[in-house]
């Protein structure tokens, strides 16, 4: 057994039993245990919690290592989940029995569906979340998950051993070394380090090492990864100051109320925990030219903006927006942080100016003329000497300005679609370490990494979601084939097959696979998904079988704009496509076969959606089949693109293929710089190789048959 100590050499260590100070044991026994797990997850953020619980659901003995147990479930930035594209990820995480959707249904204070003006394929489920309630509910779930142990500790290094010969990679991870020198061993390790890899907080011209305000960064682990040969990049993000609710003049602002009824994130919930009338509103205001003036006059005091490090394109700081789009008004959403919280989160005002300038800027905005910046609950500051409007203090009533965070990430083209790294076997990455931004993107990667880390332990095939199966598949495929040079955010526009990959049908796409192929889905959820699938198929069949003349339909449903000029019979499924018609009105017109389909609200709504997209879905399914054929053509894992001579590829293409190591022809075709001609040549090579291999296998079978026949003949003689 060996471990890598971040200094470029292999050091032998002995395997010893050791008792660890566990935050929670997965059994009643308190006896000392050998520190060996199936899966170790490093980091207790949104990716880490999903990864740890997914691995445990798959049957793996899992250890979650986090700096502080009391920060599990902490929403470090915005108090919201979901949105356009992100809401799809939430539904898919839930379809695989993930946590965040169910926890949001128990913790929200304002639920709304975005993009309602467009079709249901691109609706974005979103919720404002009570930070305190979310953290409580998440910790309760984590600390009561069977097979999952939680331990406080920081990881300094990785324990590495010789690689498995049947897999690519120069070594294999077999555990971790903590900062106190103790070791924990495992069959698979998942890194979900968020912004902690060499994290640096920035306010004005001041910087301080931290992965998040109040938490130390991970330096040793970052150095280890770099020395192992991983390509490391640098990204940045930021968060706005928090404002005292009582100091805001809401009466002059645009008020936005939640939806009624509220749509839950989870397929297992019919409603959310709180009634619409008890939910909190959000408010909208805008910046003005005075804000632009403050930003432009003080750029010399803002090192974060001057950095060449790339920040999030779709959630930029106010300084970046002013520089990129001068002389414009920018939206500022005032979002509640909880039912009992006196804090308001100003979405759109992420900034890193010195503290006194931040307050000056905020009071220039309509409704915020008397706004007071205060510190969020639960923040333990590690910046005793950073001067920001005096001194930053841990006292709640003193101001805490917005700040930026710069951190390391690893080029995601160094991981496979299962999120295992090419360089180190059984090492998985998930979340911001792969260059993404957002809770939802992190959670989606976390659940896939947890599943595959567990499957790797049991030597089962990886669980890969393709671009044709889910937004998760698009997210991971974009990362592993295209890479990213800025924080990656999910949008519906990134998805080719949006009409098939809708929020309403994520369970049909992923729950059945998750149960059969990964074992990460509970029996109860699986049975519910099977019932919904069979009910939809039966309902569509019944709707297709009911036919009347258009004149009769017009009499039965007079509110529908049905043309009576058609002479041919019209199916009930076609009538359901009209905007004015739903399953309730159809059931009133034809109660006998249709009434039972209105008893479940979700079933009735999904039948309406299926009817709406029936014709276009048929054509899209044909396109999906073509893509799936390309994805089915697997490339050899041990193919050396730099040296193979049987295929004509340019040096540039060889380098790109060597770096990204695509697993299929389809993935190779999406790598920038890999030409169509190169794909054709690669396709020919793969098919020729497959034919040769098949011929060799047949020849081997024939030889074996002849040998067996000779032996049989000798016995008879």
UniProtKB/Swiss-Prot annotation:
Modified residues (N6-methyllysine): 533
GO BP terms: mitochondrial tRNA wobble uridine modification; tRNA methylation
Reactions catalysed according to its record: 5,10-methylenetetrahydrofolate + uridine(34) in tRNA + taurine + GTP + A + H2O = 5-taurinomethyluridine(34) in tRNA + 7,8-dihydrofolate + GDP + AH2 + phosphate + H(+)
Compartments in which it is found: Mitochondrion
GO molecular function, one term: tRNA 5-taurinomethyluridine synthase activity
Known partners and oligomeric status: Homodimer; forms a dimer in the presence of potassium. Interacts with GTPBP3; forms the GTPBP3-MTO1 complex composed of homodimers of GTPBP3 and MTO1.
Similarity annotation: Belongs to the MnmG family.
Clinical note on disease: Combined oxidative phosphorylation deficiency 10: An autosomal recessive disorder resulting in variable defects of mitochondrial oxidative respiration. Affected individuals present in infancy with hypertrophic cardiomyopathy and lactic acidosis. The severity is variable, but can be fatal in the most severe cases.
Protein name: 5-taurinomethyluridine-[tRNA] synthase subunit MTO1, mitochondrial
Taxonomic lineage: Eukaryota, Metazoa, Chordata, Craniata, Vertebrata
